[in-house]
């Protein structure tokens, strides 16, 4: 038999089948760096509309984890897709550099007794070292950005501008000093922001404590009695015995009914609804003697159980009946509600008792408990209450309690003198900060939409923002306070600018080493220079002030507003929150137009990632084994709005999907062998009908993909691209064109038509995948024929796809019908192969018994129907002529019969045809193949 291989147009490409991503991706990174890709994008972006995604800074401590990878990949997909959509989309990565975790790390390594300036020096060095490690990992993920010039909150200019941002807020009168309970961590020795608090289960003692009545006559009158004939106690329930020494009041709800209960040796005042449960807890019998509304008990005095002072009854709406006694003991220094209630009743700051020091130890002067750590003092307080006859019950409970997110230790509320940004404080002009922020939320688009209600609820209910910390490694609050009055220097804003100019040159050390006389002259003796530092959420929360209008100037002409902030859903109470407050305080609007949140990573069973569970996925390991593009494809394929599942099995599925996309792309490239777009590209009207349909299908898909990218539905992009490769291309079009591509003349219209379609599809596909499969798209780009830009990222969405007119005979609807018929034929061919009735599809002859309308439609393909069905023969017949052994199909009005061909197999095209052997010189070939190698070539019109 003659070998006709040389007469075929066999696919050929140097594009490798095996991706080898871990080895090949670093070469692409070097290529991007060598050509200065990011800089070139900025150079061509001048005339483009701008899209700014402002990077929420990760903390400069530790290696990146899978959550970091998700976040950075999502951002990169957006930046790349916006670039391809014709935007100038700069991406300036940033880092959060100040704060306790770094200071704690330095103290752990070098000891706690370092001089403050040395601590700051070592913190700066440590943060810089951590940034370099994280930066290398982010770059390895394929994230395109200004890596040579990222923003860092510890850069001198950033530190200076943070002071300027604070000055703006001082100028507008948002900042004040106050004594308030704040979240306090003994291990940090500092106040914590709301976002630094997490909740965990804690075992706590619960006690019911009786406070003896001091105003017995008033209590009797409140209950409508002439007098009391035995001692009386009002009973509180608490889970914090350590706060009893600081008790200064008792709170009742004005509308709750309270009962005077005769409990034998004494009267007890309890909420009427809780009498039964309380008596059961006390193991006592009792009888309700009288009832009264809470408002009747207002200002009645009771005695502290073991100190010689009174505790008056105050009315408070927050008192509830879900647990306890219906009476809340009030220690204004250690509870926010308690604090505000006592202030409402006229208690001054000087009157508030605060016996717990910053390290959690009672002051030495506190009777009975001085010098004791509060958690260890709990049993001693209980014992004292029992000793004085005020302990009615003592139990333990497990409950959710606030903990430090760094040390995982319990927190307390503690009233300290701190600097605050007032939420409801009236500024010099305009609405309060809370009003501004709530209004700004209505002007912001949230993805997903539920984020709006979440952030609104947090802003609506949050307290004033405590912005001061008592630490070394942080941006200073450069205030001078008058020693006598405690007031800020009248030139504070002006002085802050002078400090900012110094910090710009020397960093935060400029403030800490500053002698007040350098700025205040002779006034210095009258002022104290404070050494508090700013909350790190103020650092990151003012990056819009520095980055968008300052160091990188990537904001819009309208001001420092980013189009998008994108972070994990925890940032509703973190970076989204603090940025909103600073933006509204300084500029009276949010610093972002859209907020996009993603969920947290979990394993395939929905469990949190944990080293103890052994279910963590390390991004560096995935990159080294599978490649960054597999990680990127996994991120894109997941609906990030909820929890994001990841495991080795899930990543392997992503690798399998990647392989299908890569193989499809390789097929396109290999069949463009010898194609010159400059000379061989056919206009749409000269292309075969099937090829026009394929290009049209790509056009429709591109519109859907562009929309999905615009709406950040990357999982839709993934599914559409994958399905296109598997179904429309792999399952239909590419199979059909193989015969034409391989067997017709190399320069024939039939072949150039399908190559034109393949070229257009490849040009579009490489762009579709570029935001997600960044490395692979760049590799594909180099193998595409024709002149092109150095990088796919220097292109925009492909505009060479043509639409199939609705009025052509073989329109979209027509090919949808043909696809359904082909699927039905394929199913029957599979059945016949399984039954060993036929071998390959080309060994089959199929007869389609169709109702008249369908038969007329299929007849439009003429003798090319067999090429669409990939059978050696395809015959149409009326449905009424179907024999008994014809099988039904899923297509209405269609029955099928498949038989094994009795004809010889062509040695070139492998079709079984009756004319094989009729040519003396080529006895192994069919007439069609002889025409293609010796004649003018077969003519195709449709497929």
UniProtKB/Swiss-Prot annotation:
Residues involved in L-isoleucyl-5'-AMP binding: 567
Keyword Metal-binding in annotation: yes
Span of the annotated motif 'KMSKS' region: 608-612
GO MF: aminoacyl-tRNA deacylase activity; ATP binding; isoleucine-tRNA ligase activity; tRNA binding; zinc ion binding
SUPFAM superfamilies from the UniProt entry: Anticodon-binding domain of a subclass of class I aminoacyl-tRNA synthetases (SSF47323), Nucleotidylyl transferase (SSF52374), ValRS/IleRS/LeuRS editing domain (SSF50677)
Origin: domain of life: Bacteria
Cofactor: Zn(2+)
Keywords from the named record: Aminoacyl-tRNA synthetase, ATP-binding, Cytoplasm, Ligase, Metal-binding, Nucleotide-binding, Protein biosynthesis, Zinc
Family indicated by similarity: Belongs to the class-I aminoacyl-tRNA synthetase family. IleS type 1 subfamily.
Written domain comment of the UniProt record: IleRS has two distinct active sites: one for aminoacylation and one for editing. The misactivated valine is translocated from the active site to the editing site, which sterically excludes the correctly activated isoleucine. The single editing site contains two valyl binding pockets, one specific for each substrate (Val-AMP or Val-tRNA(Ile)).
Assembly, per entry: Monomer.
Record-given protein name: Isoleucine--tRNA ligase
Gene of this entry: ileS
């Amino acid at each position: 038999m003659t070998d006709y291989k040389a007469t075929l147009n066999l696919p050929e490409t140097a594009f490798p089948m095996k991706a080898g991503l871990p080895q090949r991706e670093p070469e692409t990174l070097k290529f991007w760096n060598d050509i200065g890709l990011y800089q070139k994008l900025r150079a061509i972006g001048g005339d483009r509309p701008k899209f700014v995604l402002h990077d929420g800074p990760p903390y400069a401590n530790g290696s990146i984890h899978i959550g970091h990878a998700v976040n950075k990949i999502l951002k990169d997909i957006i930046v790349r897709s916006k670039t391809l959509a014709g935007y100038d989309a700069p991406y300036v990565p940033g880092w959060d550099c100040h704060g306790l975790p770094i200071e704690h790390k330095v103290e752990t390594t070098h000891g706690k007794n370092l001089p403050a300036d040395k601590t700051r020096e070592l913190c700066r060095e440590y943060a810089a070292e951590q940034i370099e490690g994280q930066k290398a990992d982010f770059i390895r993920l394929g994230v395109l950005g200004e890596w040579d010039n990222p923003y860092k909150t510890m850069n001198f200019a950033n530190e200076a501008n943070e002071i300027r941002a604070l000055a703006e807020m001082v100028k507008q009168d948002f900042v004040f000093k106050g004594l308030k309970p704040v979240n306090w961590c003994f291990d940090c020795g500092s106040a914590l922001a709301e976002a630094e608090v997490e909740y965990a289960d804690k075992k706590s003692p619960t006690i019911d404590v009786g406070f003896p009545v001091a105003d017995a006559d008033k209590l009797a009158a409140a209950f409508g009695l002439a007098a009391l004939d035995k001692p009386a106690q009002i009973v509180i329930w608490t889970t914090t015995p350590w706060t009893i020494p600081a008790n200064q009041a008792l709170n009742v709800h004005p509308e709750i009914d309270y009962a005077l209960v005769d409990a034998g040796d004494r009267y007890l005042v309890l909420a009427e609804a809780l009498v039964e449960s309380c008596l059961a807890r006390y193991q006592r019998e009792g009888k309700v003697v009288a009832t009264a509304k809470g408002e009747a008990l207002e200002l009645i005095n009771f005695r502290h159980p073991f100190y010689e002072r009174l505790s008056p009854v105050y009315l408070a709406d927050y008192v509830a009946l879900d647990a306890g006694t219906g009476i809340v003991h009030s220690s204004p220094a250690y509870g926010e509600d308690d604090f505000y209630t006592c202030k409402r009743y006229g208690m001054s700051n000087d009157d508030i008792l605060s016996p717990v020091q910053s390290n959690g130890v009672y002051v030495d002067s506190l009777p009975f408990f001085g010098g004791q750590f509060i958690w260890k003092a709990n049993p001693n307080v209980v014992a004292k209450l029992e000793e004085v006859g005020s302990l009615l019950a003592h139990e333990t409970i497990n409950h959710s309690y606030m903990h430090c997110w760094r040390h995982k230790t319990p927190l307390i509320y503690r009233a300290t003198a701190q600097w605050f940004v007032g939420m409801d404080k009236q500024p010099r002009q305009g609405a309060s900060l809370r009003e501004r922020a709530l209004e700004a939320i209505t002007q912001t688009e949230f993805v997903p939409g539920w984020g709006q209600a979440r952030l609104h609820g947090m802003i609506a209910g949050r307290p004033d923002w405590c912005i001061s910390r008592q630490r070394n490694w942080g941006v200073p609050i450069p205030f001078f306070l008058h020693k006598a009055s405690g007031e800020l220097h009248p030139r504070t804003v002006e002085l802050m600018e002078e400090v900012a100019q110094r910090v710009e040159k020397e960093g935060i050390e400029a403030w800490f080493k500053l002698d007040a006389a350098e700025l205040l002259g002779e006034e210095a003796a009258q002022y104290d220079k404070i050494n508090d530092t700013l909350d790190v959420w103020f650092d990151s929360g003012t990056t819009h002030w520095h980055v968008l209008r300052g160091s990188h100037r990537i904001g819009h002409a309208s001001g420092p507003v980013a189009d998008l902030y994108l972070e994990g859903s925890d940032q509703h109470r973190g970076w989204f929150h603090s940025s909103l407050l600073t933006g509204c305080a300084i500029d009276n609007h949010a610093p972002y137009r859209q907020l996009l949140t993603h969920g947290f990573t979990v394993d395939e069973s929905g469990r949190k990632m944990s080293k103890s569970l052994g279910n963590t996925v390390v991004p560096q390991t995935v990159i080294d084994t599978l490649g960054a593009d597999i990680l990127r494809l996994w991120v894109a394929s997941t609906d990030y709005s909820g929890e994001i599942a990841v495991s080795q099995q899930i990543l392997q599925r992503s690798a399998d999907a990647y392989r299908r996309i890569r193989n499809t792309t390789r097929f396109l490239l290999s069949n463009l062998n010898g194609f010159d777009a400059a000379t061989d590209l056919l206009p749409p009207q000269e292309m075969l009908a099937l090829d026009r349909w394929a290009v049209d299908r790509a056009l429709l898909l591109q519109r859907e993909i562009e929309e999905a990218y615009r709406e950040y539905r990357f999982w839709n992009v993934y599914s559409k691209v994958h399905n296109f490769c598997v179904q429309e291309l792999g399952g239909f079009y590419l199979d059909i064109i193989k015969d034409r591509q391989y067997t017709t003349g190399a320069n024939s219209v039939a072949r150039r038509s399908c190559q034109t379609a393949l070229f257009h599809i490849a040009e579009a596909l490489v762009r579709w995948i570029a935001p997600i499969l960044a490395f692979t798209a760049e590799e594909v780009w180099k193998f595409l024929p024709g002149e092109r830009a150095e990088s796919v990222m220097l292109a925009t969405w492909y505009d060479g796809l043509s639409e199939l007119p609705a009025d052509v005979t073989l329109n979209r609807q027509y090919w949808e019908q043909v696809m359904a018929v082909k699927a039905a034929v394929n199913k029957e061919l599979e059945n016949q192969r399984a039954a060993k009735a036929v071998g390959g599809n080309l060994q089959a002859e199929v007869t389609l018994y169709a109702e008249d309308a369908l038969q007329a439609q299929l007849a439009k393909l003429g003798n090319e129907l067999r090429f669409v069905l990939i059978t050696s023969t395809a015959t149409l017949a009326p449905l009424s002529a179907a024999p008994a052994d014809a099988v039904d199909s899923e297509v209405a009005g269609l029955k099928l019969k498949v038989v094994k061909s009795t004809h010889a197999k062509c040695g070139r095209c492998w079709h079984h045809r009756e004319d094989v052997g009729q040519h003396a010189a080529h006895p192994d070939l069919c007439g069609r193949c002889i025409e293609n190698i010796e004649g003018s070539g077969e003519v195709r019109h449709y497929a």
